[in-house]
UniProtKB/Swiss-Prot annotation:
Keyword Transcription regulation: no
Lineage: Bacteria, Pseudomonadati, Pseudomonadota, Gammaproteobacteria, Enterobacterales
Essential cofactor(s): Zn(2+)
Pathway: Amino-acid degradation; L-threonine degradation via oxydo-reductase pathway; glycine from L-threonine: step 1/2
Function statement: Catalyzes the NAD(+)-dependent oxidation of L-threonine to 2-amino-3-ketobutyrate.
Protein name: L-threonine 3-dehydrogenase
Length: 341
């Protein structure tokens, strides 16, 4: 079968032929329809320090997809041939304390599809049936293919009660924009998203977010005054991993504010911890999606009218995968979808 693989320990990704993966007793074989390129895939393409330490070579990559069930392991129940599915990209062990306690998203032995084991940038993918999620009929293939990053956004945004709250989202990448859109959809009062990339901020404006602020050109305190905010943000969603953005968030949070962090900062990031202490801030780390509560909420949000379509900016045939990666690497894109049909 055709597959996009990391064949060499250098920059790039290559189309190759690999065997169709073998189906285990508890697995599903999925024929891939559409995949989306994640920031993680760009890291792997660029072969940065994280990738060099993490990714085995050669390996099929990718973990954002939608497809059709074409094979079912003999011990699998609840699925049938033809089911349209996406899937949770974190494969968990099932035997650690968190897994046995129903907190599988906190599994200490998590293995990543397309990171630690073969991924979805291929004609076929095998995953445990436990990880598959049936896509409702009224959700398009395009939207289903981005459920993985959408799940990151939903998990982060819905970590706290947002109704009537003022929310700051730092980082207008696709996940940050989706998180801001979720916050607005579920009843936040003001949702402000910040970045220095004007293309991405314009995407955010198309999603109906209260205010998209280019912090290279305007002061966040001025934006708050413009919106009539007098006490600071109630909730912060840190999606950028950029130390200056996090420091600004700490400066502008109200006392008792709550922060969910999905962005990965450098290990040596320094902050003024007195702001956390004296403001009584609560900071929560976010990794992946809750299995599978986040997935049900994703589907429900779309079915209740949340429109994510503006975040999908580029579509290519898989044969034009290089154009897709070029678009992602340019910083001038939202989500990029590759069609395998």
């Amino acid at each position: 079968m055709k597959a996009l693989s990391k064949l060499k320990a250098e920059e790039g990704i290559w189309m190759t032929d690999v065997p169709v993966p073998e189906l285990g007793h508890n697995d599903l074989l999925i024929k891939i329809r559409k995949t989306a390129i994640c920031g993680t895939d760009v890291h792997i393409y660029n072969w940065d320090e994280w990738s060099q330490k993490t990714i085995p070579v050669p390996m099929v990559v990718g973990h954002e997809y939608v497809g059709e069930v074409v094979g079912i392991g003999q011990e699998v129940k609840g699925f049938k041939i033809g089911d349209r599915v996406s899937g949770e990209g974190h494969i968990t062990c099932g035997h650690c304390r968190n897994c046995r306690g129903g907190r599988t998203h906190l599994c200490r032995n998590t293995i990543g599809v397309g990171v630690n084991r073969p991924g979805c940038f291929a004609e076929y993918l095998v995953i445990p049936a436990f990880n598959a999620f049936k896509i409702p009929g009224n959700i398009s293939d395009d939207l289903a293919s981005i459920f993985d990053p959408f799940g990151n956004a939903v998990h982060t945004a819905l970590s706290f009660d947002l109704v009537g709250e003022d929310v700051l989202v730092s980082g207008a990448g696709p996940i940050g924009i989706m998180a801001a859109a979720v916050a607005k959809h579920v009843g936040a009062r003001n949702v402000v998203i910040t970045d220095v990339n004007e293309y991405r901020l314009e995407l955010a404006r198309k999603m109906g977010i209260t205010r998209a602020a280019n912090v290279a050109k305007e002061n966040l305190n001025d934006v708050m005054a413009e919106l009539g905010m007098t006490e600071g943000f109630d909730v912060g969603l840190e999606m950028s991993g950029a130390p200056p953005a996090f420091r600004t968030m700490l400066d502008t949070m109200n006392h008792g504010g709550r922060i969910a962090m999905l962005g990965i900062p450098p290990s040596d990031m320094s902050i003024d911890w007195t702001k956390v202490i004296f403001k009584g801030l609560f900071i929560k780390g976010i990794y992946g999606r809750e299995m599978f509560e986040t997935w049900y909420k994703m589907a429900a949000l779309i079915q209740s009218g949340l429109d994510l379509s503006p975040i999908i900016t580029h579509r290519f045939s898989i044969d034009d995968f290089q154009k897709g990666f070029d678009a992602m690497r340019s910083g001038q894109s939202g989500k990029v979808i590759l069609s395998w049909d």
